[in-house]
Amino acid sequence: MKKNFSAIIAVIFAVGAALYAQTTEQGKQDALFLYNSGRFEEAIKICQKEIEQNPNRVDSYVVMCWSLVRSRQYAEAELRANAGLLVSPYDLRLIEILGEARFYLGKNNGAMEQFQKYIAAAPENGARVGTAYYFMGELYVRKARYLHADIALSAAVRKEPLLERWWVRLGYAREMAKNYRGSLSAYDEALRLNPSSADAQNGRTRVASLLQ
């Protein structure tokens, strides 16, 4: 009888643990689903609850920070990313999103440091490598270091060649560096991707007049 009772208790605990794991995994999926659906505030609330239940749940910090940046809550994103990095100091997702938060806060040196860390550690096919190069390019533009911006933005468009906005910014960096032919080429590519891009058309007109 005691053996049967012990077996029943063991089964109850096993089922409970399985249900808890399933609920936890479902919570992660729900938060990520909400983020991917553009429902950032809802995703943030779910992640907050998950972190309250388990402060070491790194995925919750990641999805929360992504959602905070997308909802333009940059100071909170910086705070949460730093908290997540205390739990997992080498998580590349947190390293990169902290760079984005600092970029939008105008913390140029801190942002650059994060993107450089990410590029140094991420594999060539890392999910955010192109994005990190793009932000580095924008940071160099802010500092009027246009040759460096050209290098970073060129790397960005090699990784993700279908983003018209990135080609426009590459055209602008080259224009400021007085590389007019290279600038014209970048603006032309932006217009090929999006013929209605006013920024690309205006940039191309400026550069073409300088080449005459």
Residue ranges of model-derived segments:
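Helix-start (N-cap) detector for alpha-helical repeat units in TPR-like alpha-solenoids
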Residues: 23-24, 58-59, 92-93, 126-130, ...
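Alpha-helical segment of the N-proximal tetratricopeptide repeat
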Residues: 25-54, 66, 70, 138
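Register position in tetratricopeptide repeats
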Residues: 36-37, 70-71, 104-105, 138, ...
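Canonical positions in the second alpha-helix
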Residues: 49-50, 83-84, 117-118, 122, ...
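Structural marker of alpha-solenoid helical repeat scaffolds
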Residues: 53, 87-88, 121-125, 159, ...
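Canonical tetratricopeptide repeat
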Residues: 63-66, 97, 131, 135, ...
